[in-house]
């Protein structure tokens, strides 16, 4: 079918380059990534440009840093570590060195699009055990709490899969 869409901006959940290609092919659009956090302002913290080699951080509003997740030591540009933001224009609920738990890399290399804003990579993982399933933050400890409350033994297995581009989470419990 023909549609008038030319561009799609996607965020809220990590997606792969394979998923980008599938979205672009199936919808006939150019797909761009956007990064945000509920704790900051939602979407709009960083955005992908036409070069699509990382996301430019909106440095008019945020100071990004990469730290060692274990020591809190600030790491140089190009090093992989935990992404931290300080908000500089948010007045009602400012954030100082907010630990996102997302593992990323920051780069000040010149972008072919001409922008000079620092770029962040797509998150490559997390520094905690949080899972993001269909846009919902899930901690294994939350699952364990529910299982124990319902009288199940603490022996369980969490299986995460992707079926037709939809995350699934199954919990297998050992019955006693």
Where are these regions (language model features)?
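Active-site glycine/GP-rich loop and adjacent strand/helix microenvironment
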Residues: 1-176
């Amino acid at each position: 079918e023909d549609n008038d869409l030319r561009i799609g901006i996607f965020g809220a959940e990590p997606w792969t380059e394979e998923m980008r290609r599938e979205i672009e092919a199936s919808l006939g659009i150019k797909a761009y990534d956007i990064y945000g956090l509920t704790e900051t302002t939602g979407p709009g913290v960083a955005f992908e440009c036409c070069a699509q080699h990382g996301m430019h951080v909106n440095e008019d509003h945020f100071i990004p840093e990469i730290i060692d997740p274990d020591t809190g030591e600030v790491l140089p540009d190009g090093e992989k570590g935990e992404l931290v933001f300080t908000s500089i224009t948010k007045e009602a609920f400012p954030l100082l060195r907010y630990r996102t738990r997302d593992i990323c890399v920051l780069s000040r290399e010149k972008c072919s699009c001409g922008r000079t804003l620092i770029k962040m990579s797509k998150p490559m993982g997390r520094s905690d055990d949080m899972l993001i399933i269909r846009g919902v933050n899930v901690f294994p400890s939350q699952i364990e709490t529910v299982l124990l409350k319902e009288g199940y033994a603490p022996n369980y297995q969490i299986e995460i899969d992707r079926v037709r581009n939809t995350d699934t989470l199954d919990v297998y419990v050992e019955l006693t």
